[in-house]
């Protein structure tokens, strides 16, 4: 069973706007009492240089993924199943690992599980755990401001992929430096992955997915590389990005109508349980990232299974009373 809910007033990484409504002044937030200036949506006052290397590499990756589609009929069924299995591992490295464990500390994981999730996270190749988690904490605390790495108020393209095509806004860097990330640096698994990130990415994201089909059931290296590595990697990237873009623009807001994140079932389907985004931004400490627990939430299934095995503990959960009170106070009435 899920662990007891934590006190909402003690939950870390609340958004700046949420702290405003709770009467807590936040430097640089909208209307905050900390004396900071108003955070403006967008980056009109700050030029962000285009990172042409990223533009080129991402364009090349997506072109290669399109080419990969023509190889699907030529590949062995086991290769396609392997590619999907690698996609699930990749997703768990982000959702159960970098997101719910390391960014939000919504549950605790023992060393074997942390090692597994770190390996899966390297397969995801979306920055190392430390950087991913730090930026995600900034995203929650300063959502929809210039300090948000993928500020949805700058449009669909920017929040989906465009934010990777430019250098980080100075506010993202500044706010990130002010966050307390000592818990991340205290984890030897996080430190190891960060130190050897390039090596682990090459092995987990490209070498292992490619060699397994070739070595075990005789798939061609060409098919293995493009399907289990390139296509799988490209799809997993876009699924994660959909949470930043689609789930911040399309859907209802039953828990807090004053924030951008929405409930989006299609994103939930692709991102194995991460599409209950209005709930997640309202109750970021909840390990399930959803009011509905096991209602198509594979990441929650995985964490619960790890708890059953004794590899995870201390799952945090919002109480029913807390959820209903929040719906009545700030929800849009859709649920």
UniProtKB/Swiss-Prot annotation:
Q: Where is this motif: Histidine box-3?
A: 277-281
InterPro entries recorded for this chain?
Answer: Acyl-CoA_DS, FA_desaturase_dom, FADS-1_CS
Found, by tissue, as follows: Detected in brain.
Bias (Gly residues) ranges: 25-36
Q: Where are the transmembrane segments?
A: 55-75, 78-98, 199-219, 228-247
Q: Which residues lie on this side of the membrane: Cytoplasmic?
A: 1-54, 99-198, 248-335
Enzyme Commission (EC) number: 1.14.19.1
Q: Which reaction does it catalyse?
A: octadecanoyl-CoA + 2 Fe(II)-[cytochrome b5] + O2 + 2 H(+) = (9Z)-octadecenoyl-CoA + 2 Fe(III)-[cytochrome b5] + 2 H2O; hexadecanoyl-CoA + 2 Fe(II)-[cytochrome b5] + O2 + 2 H(+) = (9Z)-hexadecenoyl-CoA + 2 Fe(III)-[cytochrome b5] + 2 H2O
Q: Which residues lie on this side of the membrane: Lumenal?
A: 76-77, 220-227
GO biological process annotations for this chain's record? unsaturated fatty acid biosynthetic process
Q: Where in the cell is it found?
A: Endoplasmic reticulum membrane
Q: Which family does it belong to?
A: Belongs to the fatty acid desaturase type 1 family.
- Describe its partners and assembly state: May self-associate and form homodimers.
User: What's the miscellaneous note?
Assistant: This protein has no ortholog in rodents.
The UniProt function text for this chain reads: Stearoyl-CoA desaturase that utilizes O(2) and electrons from reduced cytochrome b5 to introduce the first double bond into saturated fatty acyl-CoA substrates. Catalyzes the insertion of a cis double bond at the delta-9 position into fatty acyl-CoA substrates including palmitoyl-CoA and stearoyl-CoA. Gives rise to a mixture of 16:1 and 18:1 unsaturated fatty acids. Involved in neuronal cell proliferation and differentiation through down-regulation of EGFR/AKT/MAPK and Wnt signaling pathways.
* Protein name according to UniProt: Stearoyl-CoA desaturase 5
Q: Which organism is it from?
A: Bos taurus (Bovine)
